[in-house]
């Protein structure tokens, strides 16, 4: 994720799965006795790659990991999350990734105007057009959790399908 993991509700997942790093690194917040709900422990076993606020880097990484089958004959299932309104910050890399037939899932959350109190830049009223217009990107906007479950199941199969592609899911 290239954005604030707490406000995108990734905190508990990160705490369970850990942060990826090539070497073990202790939690600097804990070491300095700074209160935090997050466990910022990095290790080679971690499954979350923290990118800071860098949407372009997210799409470059998703595109690269999404080409693993072509490059190494081993399919990965890269999933990225981003503030939905910030999808546009990485459109060049998203466009190239889709045209190269990279396979990944991008989740834009929260979508719509739910972040309106944070200002106009946080309202994602134009991003549905990205999902609709980008070749190689299938777009969904589920309203209920049971829909999301079915969409994710379909998406993992779609990523592996010879005629498949990448998937964009907008969540509110």
What would you call each of these model-derived segments?
Residues 1-172:
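Thiamine diphosphate
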